[in-house]
């Protein structure tokens, strides 16, 4: 049996290894929850045996040593970490400790913030001018990232307003909105660049570039949450007051900061944020709860690595470790072959996960994944679970290589990978049962033709029984034929037939989206429908003319042109129209005749809107003569930026495109 000293040494060595991977290499090997568990185990042992605590124990310091490639900045005031709680009982115990330590009847008010999942930084302003910036590093010394921080547009290079201190060190989190993270990885997969496991790693990797020009291209943003150095000036005597003052000076502060008068209000805030988490547009892993009064903070003081007046209340882990039992290959509606990891079932963020996407062959190679490996699984919001990384230090001896198929696992056709593309595809087309099934499921989906009651299992049976080969065949189905399907009685069958009849009346945009043309999503379909107005005009369009549509480049234009050039596709469209599929005649909007500040402009919406839905905003803009695009380009005239706007806002600023916020949009809509 190991001695206490051996257990402590082993735990400290393991934690230091993972701290180095997380803080220095930006390549964590284990989930945060596993790190937290190890840290709790170490802290509990040290609490029982305080005589064995060493000055270099992970419980006594923060982070890891800085990279040698950066010069170093010593923090004048140490950048400490926060203690964590993981459930209501632990938070209430923390609340009681605070009340007991203050030993007074004075009320405690809590300032609650989002716990952003990014990289902690300190930014020093002298006479209102940004002079330096550093990472947290080991809490005492960080890396000099001044040049990179200066490229982040959310961070002012000069504060504005009155009574700015002579020296002010602001602390906060640099992070990457989810939209920006997805765009970076999408570009990386296309070009063979580095794919990041999550937004936190992407933010850290972007901020710690030796070339600031690379950082400048990444849509990083920033929220401040505290103060380090303060000289030659004053700040309010509450934490919230300080954040509001920062905002007046031009520093970005989250609008979700909330003052809570009791522990019950704090718990309500925690649960509301947890509920809103999937819609925020950026990653958080909990909430931070701080005593609002600076005087009370001073009374409470600090322990070795954290303040006694604050705590991080973390959400259930979104990452867990498990084993890959097998890798199977699925075929999508465009023939894309997607590897899927079959996992030893594990609960992640409250959901039992047994499968995770592996994206493509490049991703398997990047991960170095083998069947039998121990892996970290991540599930965030509604995102499909994915393998974040392989725990190489715990690789079993009997793992097997993952062999990507050369023939379709469904129809046996050749698998082809076009040069420059990450995706391998089955060449079978509609002779492939899997492609046929997925194409039909897309066609009847809610945002396409919206056939109520026609679920995936019905489509599967229709294809397997050879009742349906093309979308047009769906409209030839009778209640009698449907009744022969599993779990389909006469009433249900008639309901499906009625839903198919109702679906015949649609819109041109929905119809185009339902056809499943490669790279044509809802926004692009709407843009094509608005620009060409009729099916005949779209079918006759050249690749050059297609590129005049907002959001349509050479790749999408080629896919659209090739789709309509294919005789079998034109035949399916003719059959659909013959079965009665139709849509209203286009209403031609002449922008020149509309008296509106949006008339004739190409507009892009980004971030979340609070006063109206995105669909309502799009519809209103189109009514006023705007063309609404899905991405920012040189053709864009105006960007409307809501909360947590990401890469689109950064690109607009880079291109010098006019940007307005939601308040200004509403004013102009009403003018």
Curated annotation (Swiss-Prot):
UniProt-annotated catalytic positions: 115
A Pfam family matched in the record = DNA_ligase_aden
Check the record and name the PROSITE patterns matching this protein: BRCT, DNA_LIGASE_N1, DNA_LIGASE_N2
Q: Which reaction is catalysed here?
A: NAD(+) + (deoxyribonucleotide)n-3'-hydroxyl + 5'-phospho-(deoxyribonucleotide)m = (deoxyribonucleotide)n+m + AMP + beta-nicotinamide D-nucleotide
Q: Which cofactor does it need?
A: Mg(2+); Mn(2+)
Per the record, GO CC terms? cytosol
Recorded superkingdom: Bacteria
- Which GO terms label this protein's molecular function in UniProt? DNA binding; DNA ligase (NAD+) activity; metal ion binding
The entry marks the following residues as binding NAD(+), namely 32-36, 81-82, 113, 136, 173, 290, 314
Q: Which InterPro entries match?
A: BRCT_dom, BRCT_dom_sf, DisA/LigA_HHH, DNA_ligase, DNA_ligase_AS, DNA_ligase_CS, DNAligase_adenylation, DNAligase_N
Q: Which residues form the BRCT domain?
A: 593-671
Q: Recite the UniProt keywords alphabetically.
A: DNA damage, DNA repair, DNA replication, Ligase, Magnesium, Manganese, Metal-binding, NAD, Zinc
Q: Name one GO biological process term.
A: DNA repair
Amino acids binding Zn(2+): 408, 411, 426, 432
Report the EC code(s) recorded for this entry. 6.5.1.2
Function comment:
DNA ligase that catalyzes the formation of phosphodiester linkages between 5'-phosphoryl and 3'-hydroxyl groups in double-stranded DNA using NAD as a coenzyme and as the energy source for the reaction. It is essential for DNA replication and repair of damaged DNA.
- Write out the similarity annotation: Belongs to the NAD-dependent DNA ligase family. LigA subfamily.
Q: Which NCBIfam families match?
A: dnlj, PRK07956.1
Q: What is this protein called?
A: DNA ligase
What is the organism of origin for this protein? Escherichia coli O6:H1 (strain CFT073 / ATCC 700928 / UPEC)
């Amino acid at each position: 049996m190991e001695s206490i000293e051996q257990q402590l040494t082993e735990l400290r060595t393991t934690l230091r290894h993972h701290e180095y991977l997380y803080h220095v290499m930006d390549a964590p090997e284990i989930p945060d929850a596993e790190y937290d568990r190890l840290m709790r185990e170490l802290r509990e042992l040290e609490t029982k045996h305080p005589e064995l605590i060493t000055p270099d124990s992970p419980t006594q310091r923060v982070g890891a040593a800085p990279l040698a490639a950066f010069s170093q900045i010593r923090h004048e005031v140490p950048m400490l970490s926060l203690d964590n709680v993981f459930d209501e009982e632990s938070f209430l115990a923390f609340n009681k400790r605070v009340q007991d330590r203050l030993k007074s009847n004075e009320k405690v008010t809590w300032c609650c913030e989002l716990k952003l999942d990014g990289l902690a930084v300190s930014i020093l302003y002298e006479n209102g001018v940004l002079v330096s910036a550093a990472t947290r590093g080991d809490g005492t010394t960080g890396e000099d990232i001044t040049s990179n921080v200066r490229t982040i547009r959310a961070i002012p290079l000069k504060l504005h307003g009155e009574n700015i201190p002579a020296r002010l060190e602001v602390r906060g989190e640099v992070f990457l909105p989810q939209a920006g993270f997805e765009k970076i990885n999408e570009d990386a997969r296309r070009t063979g660049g580095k794919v990041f496991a999550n937004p936190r790693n992407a933010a850290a990797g972007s901020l710690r570039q030796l070339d600031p020009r690379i950082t400048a291209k990444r849509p990083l943003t920033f929220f401040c949450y505290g103060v380090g150095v303060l000289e030659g000036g004053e700040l309010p005597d509450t934490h919230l007051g300080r954040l509001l003052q920062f905002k007046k000076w031009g520093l970005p502060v989250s609008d979700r900061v909330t003052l809570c008068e009791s522990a019950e209000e704090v718990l309500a805030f925690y649960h509301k944020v947890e509920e809103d988490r999937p819609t925020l547009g950026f990653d958080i892993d909990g909430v931070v709860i701080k005593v609002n009064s600076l005087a009370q903070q001073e009374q409470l003081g600090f322990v070795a690595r954290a303040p006694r007046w604050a705590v991080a209340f973390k959400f259930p882990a979104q990452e867990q470790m498990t084993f890959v039992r097998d890798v199977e290959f699925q075929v999508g509606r465009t023939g894309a072959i997607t590897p899927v990891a079959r996992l030893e079932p594990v609960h992640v963020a409250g959901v039992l996960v047994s499968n995770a996407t592996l994206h493509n062959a490049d991703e398997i190679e990047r991960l170095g994944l083998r069947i039998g490996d121990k892996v970290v699984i991540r599930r965030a919001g509604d995102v499909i679970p994915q393998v974040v990384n392989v725990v190489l230090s715990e690789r079993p001896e009997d793992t097997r290589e993952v062999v990507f198929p050369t023939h379709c696992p469904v129809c046996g056709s050749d698998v082809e990978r076009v040069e420059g593309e990450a995706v391998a595809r089955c060449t079978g087309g509609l002779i492939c049962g899997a492609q046929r099934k997925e194409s039909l499921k897309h066609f009847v989906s809610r945002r396409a033709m919206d056939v109520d009651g026609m679920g995936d299992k019905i489509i599967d049976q229709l294809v397997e029984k050879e009742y349906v080969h093309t979308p047009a065949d769906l409209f030839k189905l009778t209640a009698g034929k449907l009744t022969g399907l599993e779990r389909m009685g006469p009433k249900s069958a008639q309901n499906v037939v009625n839903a198919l009849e109702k679906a015949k009346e649609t819109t041109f945009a929905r119809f185009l989206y339902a056809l499943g043309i490669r790279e044509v999503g809802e926004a692009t379909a709407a843009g094509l429908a608005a620009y060409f107005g009729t099916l005949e005009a779209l079918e006759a369009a050249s690749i050059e003319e297609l590129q005049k549509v907002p959001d349509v480049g050479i790749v999408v234009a080629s896919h659209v042109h090739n789709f309509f050039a294919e005789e079998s596709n034109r035949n399916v469209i003719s059959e659909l129209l013959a079965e009665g599929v139709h849509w209203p005649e286009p209403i031609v909007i002449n922008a020149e005749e509309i008296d509106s500040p949006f008339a004739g402009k190409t507009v892009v919406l980004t971030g979340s809107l609070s006063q109206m839905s995105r669909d309502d905003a799009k519809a209103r803009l189109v009514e006023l003569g705007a063309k609404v695009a899905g991405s920012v380009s040189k053709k864009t005239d105006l960007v409307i930026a809501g909360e947590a706007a990401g890469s689109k806002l950064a690109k607009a600023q880079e291109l010098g495109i006019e940007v307005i916020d939601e308040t200004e949009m509403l004013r102009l809509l009403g003018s």
